[in-house]
Amino acid sequence: SDVYKRQLILGLNDGGLSYWVACIRECFEEVGILLATKKSGEKLNLEDEDKSKFDQYRKMLINNEINILDVCKEEDLILSTSNIAPLSHWITPEFETRRYDTRFFIAYLPEKQIVQHDGMELTKSLWINPNMALKKALDGEMQMILPTTENLKSCMEFKSAMDMLDNQKKISNNEIKPILPKFFKDNGNWIVLFPGDEGYEDH
């Protein structure tokens, strides 16, 4: 089934669909983009008179007054994974007190929807290509954590967002391996090693 395929792509035998649903929910909560279609097959238009209604749904989601499935039932929507693909799987280094096991996805922006950050989890947003974003990080103009810079590096080889989405959709089952970075000091400098790097297993 399609559900089972979505799980296997993430290397999971059970519970994998929840990651895809969480991705869609987070996109809607944090940037106002709802990756869904009407049951009739019609695409969502959040630039028209429906915008204020869906803005209210978004506020209620953020306040935990409803969940994403409530929105689907109320508006006869089907959550869509057609413009989403898994990108990477990161695990927080062991020395951190707060640790996460996080899946990253890429999503292609649907037509007739406007990006608007929520002002809480995301306080600023802009359109920028990966090369320029990495340059700004290197120059100290943008602060980025390691998973962000590495995810951006993986975007650089593609000519367009759709090229990258098409490539990621071809990923076979369990192809995305978890990345648990390891850090150590060498002559006073911090060194980071990734799985597969020489010396990784020694630290």
Task: State what each model feature region is.
Residues 31-39, 159:
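A generic secondary-structure signal for well-formed alpha-helical elements
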Residues 43-87, 92:
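Charged mid-protein connector segments
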Residues 95, 114-116, 202:
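Short helix/loop capping segments that flank catalytic or ligand/cofactor-binding pockets
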